[in-house]
């Protein structure tokens, strides 16, 4: 979502008639921001509860809820759900924000048209404003600033996961090649390593039938 990068890509597309592309803000970068906003509130609420609750109550009902809070609700086991219910008794604002976060995640997980996504996101923003869920104000601002690019995700639901995974592999290989000075040698090593990974990856067998 860096403006400099987005502007550079837009300029390139505008200057090349043979390039047809749709700019998309990756959904995982979007999720990172609204989850960070939720986490900011979580820290504030944990600090408040530690000051207000008796130590034994805090230890029993609040401590140890970090990972259950960070997990998607559908991935929680029964024990984790019980822990969150106990926590939310003392932190209704956190419960409200948790529910809004899960509703937003559900929107991005749902297969739908761009128009449907627009309606659901608009409804979510209205709900945030109506409930005065101030922790999400930074995200709502980002959502408004990059509205079209975020909505574009729902056209094909494509993410940059493959590219980022490839970049991680390249960084790992580059660290192993410390001391290599010639760029051509480094690129040869990258090519050999990545090609080897492709050839050693188990592949599904296909049968071609002829009539």
What are these regions (language model features)?
Residues 35-47:
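Short, surface-exposed amphipathic charged segments that create phosphate/polyanion-binding patches used
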Residues 18-23, 46-50:
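Short, polar/flexible loop-turn hinges at active-site or ligand-entry regions and domain interfaces
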Residues 2-18, 28-35, 51-211:
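Acidic/histidine-rich catalytic cores and adjacent linkers
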């Amino acid at each position: 979502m860096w403006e400099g990068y987005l502007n550079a890509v837009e300029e390139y597309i505008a200057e090349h008639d043979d390039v047809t592309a749709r700019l998309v803000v990756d959904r995982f970068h979007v999720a990172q921001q609204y989850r960070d906003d939720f986490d900011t509130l979580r820290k504030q609420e944990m600090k408040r509860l530690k000051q207000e609750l008796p130590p034994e109550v805090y230890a029993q009902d609040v401590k140890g809820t970090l990972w259950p809070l960070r997990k998607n609700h559908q991935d929680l086991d029964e024990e984790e759900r019980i822990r969150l219910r106990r926590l939310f008794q003392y932190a209704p604002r956190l419960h409200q924000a948790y529910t809004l976060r899960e509703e937003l995640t559900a929107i991005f997980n749902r297969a739908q048209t761009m128009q449907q996504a627009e309606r659901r996101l608009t409804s979510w923003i209205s709900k945030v404003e109506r409930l005065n869920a101030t922790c999400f104000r930074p995200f709502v601002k980002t959502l408004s600033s990059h509205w079209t690019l975020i909505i574009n995700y729902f056209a094909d639901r494509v993410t940059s996961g493959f590219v980022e995974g490839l970049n991680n592999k390249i960084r790992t290989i580059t660290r192993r090649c410390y001391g290599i000075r010639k760029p051509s040698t480094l690129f040869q090593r990258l090519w050999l390593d990545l090609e080897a990974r492709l050839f050693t990856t188990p592949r599904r067998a296909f049968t071609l039938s002829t009539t």
